[in-house]
Design a protein with these regions (language model features):
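N-terminal nicking endonuclease/strand-transfer module with a His-rich metal-binding environment
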Residues: 1-175
Length: 175
């Protein structure tokens, strides 16, 4: 994540700092600056899962590992759907109830008039509407790739309300 911050924000941070006449207004390291800021999240985590414990319970590890191809495709689809979410890391877990992928990334917004021109911007990138669109598109892409990899014609269960949560890092015990 720290390397991605350098890649995404260094030029904007240097431009901003060079315009500052007072040393106390200079940001220096944007990663450290945001990590000390209680108003912004340093990064966001998305979890992509297809199927539940009942579906995966009797499947072999080889069968489960075929999901790697499905999840790799999901990374590229996510970058198409949300180009302002820059993926720093993606890990697939096979050791729990069902194979699922954790993605960690930074929501980046360009074109700010105040402060740095480019900033971390979770609330601008992930709105209620954009999250609904994201989930709908990713569900369609995921089942399409699943059917291609597993040579099936499976369908998804209807979406359940209340399953998505925005969890602050301080509340993540047990996740």
């Amino acid at each position: 994540v720290q390397n991605l911050y350098q890649k995404e924000f260094l030029l904007a941070q240097l431009e901003y700092d060079n315009k500052q006449t007072r040393a106390d207004r200079k940001i220096g390291d944007y990663f450290n600056h945001i990590s000390k800021d209680s108003k912004h999240d340093l990064a966001c985590e998305l979890i992509i899962e297809l199927g539940d414990m009942d579906f995966w319970n009797d499947k072999t590890m080889d069968y489960k590992k075929q999901m790697t191809e499905v999840y790799k495709d999901q990374i590229y689809k996510l970058m198409e759907v949300v180009p302002d979410f820059k993926v720093a890391n993606a890990v697939v877990h096979y050791d729990e109830t069902s194979p699922h992928m954790h993605l960690v990334g930074i929501p980046v917004k360009d074109g700010y008039k105040n402060g740095m021109k480019k900033q971390v911007a979770k609330s601008k990138i992930f709105t209620k509407e954009s999250l609904k669109t994201l989930q709908d598109k990713m569900r369609a892409y995921c089942i399409e790739k699943f059917n291609e990899v597993y040579v099936q014609n499976a369908t998804l269960k209807k979406k359940q309300k209340g399953r998505n949560k925005d969890i602050h890092v301080n509340e993540m015990d047990g996740y």
